[in-house]
Swiss-Prot record:
Protein name: 3-methyl-2-oxobutanoate hydroxymethyltransferase
Catalyzed reactions per annotation: 3-methyl-2-oxobutanoate + (6R)-5,10-methylene-5,6,7,8-tetrahydrofolate + H2O = 2-dehydropantoate + (6S)-5,6,7,8-tetrahydrofolate
Gene name per UniProt: panB
PANTHER family named among the record's database cross-references: 3-METHYL-2-OXOBUTANOATE HYDROXYMETHYLTRANSFERASE
Superkingdom of the organism of origin: Bacteria
Length: 264
């Protein structure tokens, strides 16, 4: 199978073809996703909550991400694999480069970092040194203590304008993808339309170029709080492979996320 690349997603945006992505943390699920044609995966620091049982993503280390990245890469050798740089792993551009090198050596194609204009120099440094970058704006879980919880971001003109400004700054610095999390649909559309790079939404309506879900949310195995934007595809299909196929089909057709999964 031909490898999925950043250029593949760029073509999807140009052709207005929505695409699905998902988090993955181990060999078996990565292989299952790849076998079903779901070829863009993120080793997210969400593993701190879903795999390790912490109440936030903050305890996750670069070594944790590298370990899971290597496992996912073995299961899905041709996928486009993103890996999070966890909390305090990119406080300076130099630190970001060192830690990005670790996860790239483990098998990542691209690193994802959370934050806006303050990251411009870091993004420039990474991309100049052949480390592709995915930005992450809106509800950035590593900032949960600043936000005072997991809340919708970008409501109101000033907050929305700031997020758009952040997105444009990241793109200008060299970011090649952007994740938008928990923002109003109207703002997600503004940002998606303004950027040349593909935008992947989670809790941002069906107006972005792609969608991502934490796999545990997509299969209803989180336990506890279920985010408004999540949908349990396993409950509807009763089979994990069928659930993956339905998730992809609903994203590609624009059925998911629906109005009930969106914020305004």
């Amino acid at each position: 199978m031909k490898p999925t690349t950043i250029a593949s997603l760029q073509k999807c945006k140009q052709d207005k073809k929505r695409f699905a992505t998902i988090t993955a943390y181990d060999y078996s699920f990565a292989k299952l996703f790849a076998d079903e044609g779901l070829n863009v995966m993120l080793v997210g620091d969400s593993l701190g909550m879903t795999v390790q049982g912490h109440d936030s993503t903050l305890p996750v280390t670069v070594e944790d991400i590298a370990y899971h990245t290597a496992a996912v890469r073995r299961g899905a050798p041709n996928c486009l694999l993103l890996a999070d740089l966890p909390f305090m792993a990119y406080a300076t551009p130099e630190q970001a480069f060192e830690n990005a090198a670790t996860v790239m050596r483990a098998g990542a194609n691209m690193v994802k970092i959370e934050g806006g204009e303050w990251l411009v120099e870091t993004v420039k440094m990474l991309t100049e040194r052949a480390v592709p970058v995915c930005g992450h704006l809106g509800l950035t879980p590593q900032s949960v203590n600043i936000f005072g919880g997991y809340k919708v971001q970008g409501r109101g003109d000033e907050a929305g304008d700031q997020l758009l400004s952040d997105a444009l700054a990241l793109e200008a610095a060299g970011a090649q993808l952007l994740v938008l999390e928990c923002v109003p649909v109207e703002l997600a559309k503004r940002i998606t339309d303004a950027l040349a790079i593909p935008v992947i939404g989670i809790g941002a309506g069906n107006v972005t170029d792609g969608q991502i879900l934490v796999m545990h949310d997509a299969f209803g195995i989180t336990g506890g709080h279920i985010p408004k934007f999540a949908k349990n595809f396993l409950a509807e299909t009763g089979d994990i492979r069928a659930a993956v196929r339905q998730y992809m089909a609903e994203v590609e057709s624009g059925v998911y996320p629906g109005e009930e999964h969106s914020f305004h």
